[in-house]
C-alpha cells in the first residue's frame, strides 16, 4: 500500500489507475480542474484526461489583496462554464480552493464583518477547548483567530455563490449536479509547531480554529472528526432541497462508479 512506503498520490500521482475525468472524457465530456492539485507532479493539460488545468498558486497570492485568495479560481471556472455552454457540451469540473486552509489571512473588508465576535469557550466541546488552550500556549489569540477564520469562510461563501449564479445564468441549473465537500476535517493546532520561528508559529496557531463539531479528531486522524466531512448536493428535480440524510454511509470510493452510472459512462474493472 502506498502509505506503507510513503509513495503518496499527492507527490507521485495515480500511475496507470483510471480516473473519473479520463472515463468522462472518453464519453464526450469536457473536463476542467481549478485549484489545489495534490495528485502528482504532472499538471499539463490532458493529464488524467483533464482538458483545462489551472493550479497556479502564484495567482492565488497575488489576488489576495483585492478580492480574496480564490477569486481567480472562480474566474477561471466561470470562464470554463461559459466556453462549455457555448459548445453545448457536457462537462465535469473540479474547483479545489485554498480558502480556510492555513495561513488564514482574510481581506480586512471581510474580517471587519466579524469584528464584534467574541469566543465563548463554554459553548464548545472538549476538542475545541483543547485547540484554544494550544493556541494560547503558542502565543496566538483565540478571538482574533476565530474572526479571521469566519472571514475566510465568508469569502468562500461569496465565491461559491458566484459559481452557482453562473451555472444558473447560463441555463445549466436543471441539468447540473453540484457537490460541495471536503478532503478531511479541520487541521490541528500542533501543525503550528512545524513553523519554528515566531511570528509564524503564532500566526499558524490561531489559524487552526476549524471545528469538527461533536466529533473527535481532525486532519491526520482516523477518528470521525478527521474522516467525516460535509457532502452537500444540489440536483434540481432529483435531490430534494433542505433535507439532511443522517442514515446513509458514503465514501469517496463511491464517487467514480456513481457518476459513471448517472452519466451512462462505461466503467472498467482494470486498475481502479
Q: What does each model-found stretch correspond to?
A:
Residues 20, 36, 255:
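Short active-site alpha-helical segment characteristic of glycosyltransferases
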Residues 1, 37-44, 52-253, 260-271:
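Active-site-proximal cap/lid insertion segments
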Residues 1-19, 23-32, 42-59, 229:
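Active-site segment of extracytoplasmic enzymes that catalyze sulfate/phosphate-ester chemistry
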